[in-house]
């Protein structure tokens, strides 16, 4: 019997991308709700409880509501793409490459929280250095990032693409999250194994999909003897044998990085920039905000759960 998959919120940006990734898969039975019925709570509850895996592509409160709808049904497993459960101790964090044991945790979990796009890049470069003892306790981490505008969902897509929108955004690039209380910071801190919350400065570019996440570091403030080469080696060791996350060879000769390079792909590239013998290093993650940063990761997690 084919596993039944229900995407609750399939008509939103992330849900549509997940649905597209499942197109043509004969190994799955996709349960669907007509767009006109998407707010029909009784129908949603029936479909949620009829699924083997429910993928929630909803705002935080609606995700909590959906989880409550299946609370008494131990057969239903959940992947939540919202921020509602990303730091919950009883949910597996769905970044399979962040730790050697993570794929098994995801495979065996009833509840999996899909990572945020920015945290995927930030944790991807920070956590290996924490585990290797290179990034010390209490280091004041900063994370700077730019995302494609689809990360803002249908509302931001309309604001940018529709010149007649009442709140049209014409700027080619803009900062947001200016009070420094972005919803992604708690998961960066927890899953990045940080003692202090990072200073996070997100921004949006006038391109649909793509993302660059940067974490600059002072070498003198890292573990004694830390170098450009030792940091790169730690990332290479951490991601050895991984097909989705690639650590690019030492990249000092690259003239630029295009935020859209991995648009439409579910992979992530990590770079280590700096001058050999210099005082600084810049860690860079490149990914698609809707790929490894959202929908691609959700499908990856679903496949891990189905392999149990």
Swiss-Prot record:
Active site: 117
Record-linked Pfam families: Semialdhyde_dh (PF01118), Semialdhyde_dhC_1 (PF22698)
Cysteine pairings via disulfide bonds: none
Membrane-crossing segments per the record: none
One annotated Gene Ontology cellular component of this protein: cytoplasm
Catalytic activity: N-acetyl-L-glutamate 5-semialdehyde + phosphate + NADP(+) = N-acetyl-L-glutamyl 5-phosphate + NADPH + H(+)
Job description of the protein: Catalyzes the NADPH-dependent reduction of N-acetyl-5-glutamyl phosphate to yield N-acetyl-L-glutamate 5-semialdehyde.
Protein name: N-acetyl-gamma-glutamyl-phosphate reductase
């Amino acid at each position: 019997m084919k596993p039944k998959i229900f995407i609750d919120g399939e008509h939103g940006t992330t849900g549509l991308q997940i649905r597209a990734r499942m197109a043509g898969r004969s190994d799955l039975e996709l349960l669907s709700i007509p767009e006109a019925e998407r707010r029909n709570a009784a129908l949603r509850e029936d479909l949620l409880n009829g699924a083997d895996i429910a993928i929630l592509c909803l705002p935080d409160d609606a995700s909590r509501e959906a989880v409550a709808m299946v609370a008494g049904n131990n057969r239903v497993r959940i992947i939540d793409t919202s921020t509602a459960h990303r730091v919950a101790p009883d949910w597996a964090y769905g970044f399979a490459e962040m730790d050697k044991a993570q794929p098994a945790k995801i495979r065996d979990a009833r509840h999996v929280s899909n990572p945020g796009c920015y945290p995927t890049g930030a944790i991807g470069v920070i956590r290996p250095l924490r585990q290797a003892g290179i990034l010390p306790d209490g280091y004041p981490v900063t994370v700077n990032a730019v995302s494609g505008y689809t990360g803002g969902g249908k509302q931001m897509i309309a604001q940018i693409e529709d010149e007649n929108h009442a709140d049209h955004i014409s700027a080619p690039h803009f900062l947001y999250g200016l009070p420094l209380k972005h919803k992604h910071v708690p998961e960066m801190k927890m899953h990045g194994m940080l003692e202090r919350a990072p200073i996070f400065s997100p921004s949006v570019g006038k391109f649909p999909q793509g993302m660059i996440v940067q974490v600059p570091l002072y070498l003198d403030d890292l573990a004694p003897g830390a170098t450009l080469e030792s940091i790169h080696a730690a990332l290479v060791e951490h991601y050895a044998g991984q097909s989705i996350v690639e650590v690019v060879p030492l990249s000092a000769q690259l003239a630029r990085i295009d935020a859209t390079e991995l648009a439409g792909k579910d992979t992530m590239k990590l770079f280590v920039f700096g001058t050999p013998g210099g005082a600084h290093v810049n860690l860079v993650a490149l990914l698609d905000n809707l790929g490894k940063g959202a929908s691609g990761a959700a499908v990856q997690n679903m496949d891990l759960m189905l392999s149990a």
